[in-house]
Amino acid sequence: MKHIVKHIHFVGIGGAGMSGIAEVLVNLGYAVSGSDLSRNAVTDRLEALGARIAIGHDAANIEGANAVVVSTAVRSDNPEVLAARHQGVPIVQRAVMLAELMRLKQGIAIAGTHGKTTTTSLVASVLAAGGLDPTFVIGGRLISAGANARLGTGDFIVAEADESDASFLNLYPVIEVITNIDADHMDTYGHDFARLKQAFIEFTQRLPFYGSAVVCVDDPNVRQIIPFISKPVVRYGLSPDAQVRAEDIDARDGRMHFTVIREGRAPLAVVLNMPGLHNVQNALAAIAIATDLGVSDDAIQLALAEFNGVGRRFQRYGEVPSADGGQYTLIDDYGHHPVEMAATIAAARGAFPGRRLVLAFQPHRYTRTRDCFDDFVNVLSTVDALVLTEVYAAGEAAIPTASGDALSRALRAVGKVDPVFVATVDDVPDALAKVAQNGDVVITMGAGSIGGVPAKLVQHIQQKA
């Protein structure tokens, strides 16, 4: 590619999926430019690495580019897209560019409705501990690396494979992981769950004959597609028929202690430095891959025990002063689907037994809120106190029956929790200051702008003091 393409421009370079690819390309020696609507820590990092960053979208931003990379979130009438089309500059989907990176190395692609980012991070961390020095492209910031991407010197590239727009079908890795299959982004599949499952089957068909599909057999939908996978399968999970499984699981001090059982290997005692059964499953995927690639048991144990997590995935901000003179534990999480939320709430209950759980939740997308409305009501009813915001639209038109206010009224009718509804995320710090008490565990959750709230909470309390 490099003998033809010298300069690559990214429309929306500050996004999690785009920025990682851009960083790897910068480190490969390409001239990289990009635009976004606002600056953030990611754009600042890319600029420091040598990328040219423009704030705002303008046709002039693509000057000199040999290719323009877009995600499915970029509209076709974006001025940079229109300019590229007018000038005959190739417009490349993000997943296609990721596929090009995978051609340079052996790809390990992590797919599934939930858990992709954490699992990708665990795989990258375990392989790095084993001396394989992988390249990785992750949808969140790996805290230990301080970045969501890194160019390694080893043979492997570890990356997320996105099913939300079916773009994972552009990838041709040598190892695939399927964590689970759930009903999300159903517009892509015509609201036909069978089509979604078929897409995952087609994803496994991208594997070479020597590749392997590493699949979580605890998920019933994954289990259903296994008979249709024609490539070698490695089963992981808590189920008795898993080839890599966890036994004797014990949650203590915010960590998961368990024994790994692998066919033909001695039992392996593991301590995972994060809570939740779902993260035990994610770790098992990493252990399965690491074992297959010859990583030592000592390296596996070390990597999992020292794993510092991923930004916005049960990210702990420590103790924050509460308005009553005490303090509460603050956690931030990206969860935005009821299944993810239930797993995070269960992890918090396990990590902090007996403590009151306060959730500040921003729903993400009106269509998801509509499609999962009853499930949202059920999962939100399991917390002890709730601050609920209006839906983060993510470019969608409002649906009055699937608004944050409608969700709040439905929760109040069920009667298990009395939500405090606020119209905007800017109102969350003040609402939490009135709700949170000494000894509480407070979780801010959602895939939208609520990710900026934790830093504001500390500032809010300091201003009130």
Swiss-Prot record:
Predominant cellular place of this UniProt entry's protein: cytoplasm
Report keywords, A-Z.
ATP-binding, Cell cycle, Cell division, Cell shape, Cell wall biogenesis/degradation, Cytoplasm, Ligase, Nucleotide-binding, Peptidoglycan synthesis
Which pathway is this protein engaged in? Cell wall biogenesis; peptidoglycan biosynthesis
Q: Where in the cell is it found?
A: Cytoplasm
Its GO CC terms are: cytoplasm
Indicate yes or no for the key word Magnesium.
no
Q: What does the sequence similarity comment in the record state about its family?
A: Belongs to the MurCDEF family.
Reactions the enzyme catalyzes: UDP-N-acetyl-alpha-D-muramate + L-alanine + ATP = UDP-N-acetyl-alpha-D-muramoyl-L-alanine + ADP + phosphate + H(+)
Name of one Pfam family that matches: Mur_ligase_C
Q: Which InterPro entries match?
A: Mur-like_cat_sf, Mur_ligase_C, Mur_ligase_C_dom_sf, Mur_ligase_cen, Mur_ligase_N, MurCDEF_pg_biosynth, UDP-N-AcMur_Ala_ligase_MurC
UniProt protein name: UDP-N-acetylmuramate--L-alanine ligase
